[in-house]
């Protein structure tokens, strides 16, 4: 069975605008096109679309996705190179997670400060500088992450 872009949008939840953009970038070179220029997606194409959507959500560049797709098309001889691409993206995303954890910890610290100040009825205070907050929390978060890493390794 084949599907038009609008049908794929309904089926996948991915906007037709995104799909068309990715089509224009060459991420779907093997789509069937009828005499009127209407492109049709197979189930396999929809599966690839879902992977593209995930890779984009993870921050992978279109260029890297194109390269990855080209490697996939070449078959098993490119497995190691594809593995390296996936591992590199995973490493980037794990680094982003650590940065987000630090940022969330800073927000929680500020939140707790405001809760304490408002519960005591204080309206004037001297907040810690951003740098000071970050240094304190970086140390705490890094210790927490190291503890979690040690648990995972056991």
Spans of features found by a protein language model:
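A short linear boundary/processing microfeature
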Residues: 25, 71-74, 113, 117
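Alpha-helical structural elements of signaling/regulatory helical domains
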Residues: 14, 60, 74-78, 95, ...
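C-terminal regulatory/oligomerization modules of transcriptional regulators
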Residues: 80-154
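Helix-centric, low-specificity signal for extended rod-like, repetitive segments
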Residues: 10-13, 49, 75, 83, ...
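Basic helix-turn-helix/winged-helix DNA-binding cores
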Residues: 1-70
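A broad detector of the eukaryotic-type serine/threonine protein kinase catalytic domain
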Residues: 51, 70-73, 91-94, 98
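Long, amphipathic alpha-helical segments that form or neighbor coiled-coils/leucine zippers used
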Residues: 67-70, 74, 80, 84-86
């Amino acid at each position: 069975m084949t599907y038009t872009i609008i049908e794929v949008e309904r089926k996948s939840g991915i906007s037709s605008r995104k799909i068309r953009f990715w089509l224009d970038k060459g991420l779907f070179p093997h789509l069937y096109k009828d005499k009127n220029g209407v492109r049709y997606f197979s189930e396999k194409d929809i599966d690839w679309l879902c992977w593209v959507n995930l890779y984009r959500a993870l921050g992978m560049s279109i260029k890297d996705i194109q390269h990855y797709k080209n490697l996939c098309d070449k078959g098993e001889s490119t497995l190691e190179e594809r593995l390296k691409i996936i591992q590199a993206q995973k490493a980037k995303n794990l680094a982003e997670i650590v940065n987000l954890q630090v940022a969330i910890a800073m927000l929680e610290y500020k939140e707790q400060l405001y809760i304490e100040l408002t519960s005591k009825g204080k309206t004037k205070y001297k907040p810690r500088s951003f740098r000071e907050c970050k240094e304190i929390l970086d140390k705490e978060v890094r210790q927490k992450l190291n503890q979690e890493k040690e648990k995972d390794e056991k």
